């Protein structure tokens, strides 16, 4: 089958990465369709309206490269699967990662299903990751060539079934090369700056945004020994290891968030970047997913490396089953500021094995006061 007989539906955001993705596939002779996903009703807020502007950029790029385009509305699915999860996690005192859930439920589920109905053989996105396809049909997900842009951390929940239908055309090139191609082809998005922040918040003030949906309750800010250091403005606004916004003056080392007590509405703080309370030996995680589950033996356990946040250096870990729903991840050496609600993502060199959601963090068999 030649490329012209293979239909690839590209998820286009109005950014340079997805624009170049569509361009490269068209150049390679595929039957390409561009789709703009509308996941958030920006008329809900008084924030900056970017969706219309982004869709106009998609239209401009698709017209330039000569492919058809559509807009598809996934607002309902996004609210049900991503945004309610996001709010529920904050209510529990955790720090969620909505990008992971968005990839799992929207971009590679709702969007993939929609694309297949359009006769797609594959979907493609502008993620910095790679797919390795084997002769027996199974696939592996590899880190993007541009180490600084690698996005496998956010794709850790994708299954074998999902990844077998996915292409990541820019995963093999550096971001600078993506920009160069866009400028060389004079694409409408060539000079557009990369978006930052959570997809549905955009450039808005996070604290203000969250306050629209969750009532904040101020409370005491204490050291672990009970010394009062001030007031916090709502536990949901703080994350483990946070330094800024505490309002603690005085001399000496800066202060950091080391824990939360939801029942008493207390925020725990301690002084010093390397304070003992910020370090842990192992964690318990749930909602684990592996790209090739048949190759993973949780009963026996296995060694690999892991990331606990995006762009963090890999840490050597040992992974084993804790119980029916959870895994235990033990670190080769103590790790600082691991945060419940975030993803732990596993790697074997350049291969991303999968990931899980961090629930509890321990030191010397004792649970840290991260969320009590």
From Swiss-Prot:
Gene Ontology cellular-component terms listed: cytoplasm
CDD domains (alphabetical): MnmA_TRMU-like
Interaction with target base in tRNA, as annotated region: 97-99
Protein's recorded name: tRNA-specific 2-thiouridylase MnmA
Superkingdom classification of source: Bacteria
Main localization category: cytoplasm
Reactions catalysed: S-sulfanyl-L-cysteinyl-[protein] + uridine(34) in tRNA + AH2 + ATP = 2-thiouridine(34) in tRNA + L-cysteinyl-[protein] + A + AMP + diphosphate + H(+)
Region spans: Interaction with tRNA: 149-151, 309-310
Gene Ontology biological-process annotations: tRNA wobble position uridine thiolation
EC number: 2.8.1.13
NCBIfam families for this protein: PRK00143.1, trmU
A Pfam family that the UniProt record links to this protein: tRNA_Me_trans
Compartments where found: Cytoplasm
Residues that hold ATP according to the record: 11-18, 37, 126
GO molecular function: ATP binding; tRNA binding; tRNA-uridine 2-sulfurtransferase activity
Matches recorded under SUPFAM superfamilies: Adenine nucleotide alpha hydrolases-like (SSF52402)
Annotated positions for site Interaction with tRNA: 127, 342
Annotated keywords: ATP-binding, Cytoplasm, Disulfide bond, Nucleotide-binding, RNA-binding, Transferase, tRNA processing, tRNA-binding
Active site: 102 (nucleophile), 199 (cysteine persulfide intermediate)
Its job: Catalyzes the 2-thiolation of uridine at the wobble position (U34) of tRNA, leading to the formation of s(2)U34.
Disulphide bridges, residue numbers: 102-199
Family membership: Belongs to the MnmA/TRMU family.
Organism: Staphylococcus epidermidis (strain ATCC 35984 / DSM 28319 / BCRC 17069 / CCUG 31568 / BM 3577 / RP62A)
InterPro entries, per the entry: MnmA-like (IPR004506), MnmA-like_C (IPR046885), MnmA-like_central (IPR046884), MnmA-like_central_sf (IPR023382), Rossmann-like_a/b/a_fold (IPR014729)
